[in-house]
């Protein structure tokens, strides 16, 4: 018997269209990673004459990529990630995961504006590895 392996890819536009299509047709909200898998599975089924079934398992929350998902559904650009979370929830009637929705009230633990030269970064990594 021969074994075959198929590989596909999806552009950002195709990924966004898949998010919108799945939501429109099934009222199911998917994240971009799942959308790539669904898009590629659809392409496989279009190309290959098979009676095989495909199961796409979604493990990521669409709210982790709320800006991409919301823009895919509405085409609207908003100010920040928290606004996208709120807007995605309002648009779809879904509830964001509590750990994500509570982020806005959490204390910032790390300074996001640190900058290191490559040699300083290498020194930090070596020191941490000791």
PLM segments and residue spans:
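PLP-dependent amino-acid enzyme catalytic core
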Residues: 1-130
């Amino acid at each position: 018997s021969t074994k075959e392996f198929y590989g596909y890819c999806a552009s950002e536009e195709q990924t966004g269209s898949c998010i919108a299509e799945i939501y429109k047709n099934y009222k199911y909200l998917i994240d971009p990673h799942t959308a790539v898998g669904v898009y590629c599975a659809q392409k496989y089924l279009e190309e290959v004459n098979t009676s095989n079934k495909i199961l796409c398992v979604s493990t990521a929350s669409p709210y982790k990529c709320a800006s991409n998902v919301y823009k895919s559904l509405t085409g609207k650009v908003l100010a920040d990630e928290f606004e996208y979370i709120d807007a995605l929830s309002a648009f779809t009637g879904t509830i964001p995961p509590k750990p994500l929705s509570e982020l806005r009230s959490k204390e910032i633990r790390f300074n996001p504006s640190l900058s290191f030269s490559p040699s300083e970064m290498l020194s930090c990594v070596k020191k941490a590895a000791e």
